[in-house]
């Protein structure tokens, strides 16, 4: 446990240190995202997004599946376009000033079912979940963004999960590239839902030992994306991510027996934006 706490502290210092280092380095002229935005327009920009990805069939799985899901975002027409990483939750900034943004966020989380993998026989299903919460974001420079999300499941899984990340963002014409580290923390309820095994499940499955994980570090990893804005309406993005399960999640007999602590994901999305008066 002490080594995990040291690892978490070191990782957090890395994120903070990276943002501070970029803050003192020479950077290009600050772009529009740092300017106060007048909220006078009654028009909104609505962005509809479709995403497909290849990812583990469930958290901790060593088998991959194809996933497709929609996305929806909106902002005032007077607000500048801001970078959003593919692994960001859907959010709306209620406050945005001097590089800081804060507001509600939500994310869809797939479940885990027996038809995902017959080797799960004897274990409980994990129902898909919607996780509402709050996000905080800070642009230290036009090219460095730090973001945190705290969410809580309201269907199926009811635990808390917190995601932290820093992105180095580079814009060249219509291209936007980004890469950065990720850290996820989860409470005991979240961990037990996906990685726990009760005594009854252990006896029924005949495969998994009883296991009751606690909260703490769920994973560390990295994410990268490359986007291209074809015009004011259409954009495309390709992305990849890696998470390494840690601590109690990695020690789960589910992960050790039929899964893997190495979680990879690749995908692509298409977005369409239009103006409307709401």
Predicted regions mapped to residue ranges:
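Cleavable N-terminal export/targeting peptides
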Residues: 1-41, 61, 259, 276-278
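Outer-membrane beta-barrel transmembrane domain signature
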Residues: 22-23, 78, 91, 153-163, ...
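Outer-envelope beta-barrel architecture signal
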Residues: 40-48, 64-68, 79-81, 96-102, ...
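Transmembrane beta-barrel strands of outer-membrane/channel proteins
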Residues: 46-54, 87, 104-110, 134, ...
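Flexible, solvent-exposed coil segments and beta strand-coil junctions
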Residues: 47-53, 112-116, 127, 140-147, ...
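Transmembrane beta-strand segments that form the barrel wall of outer-membrane beta-barrel proteins
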Residues: 48-56, 80-89, 117-121, 144-154, ...
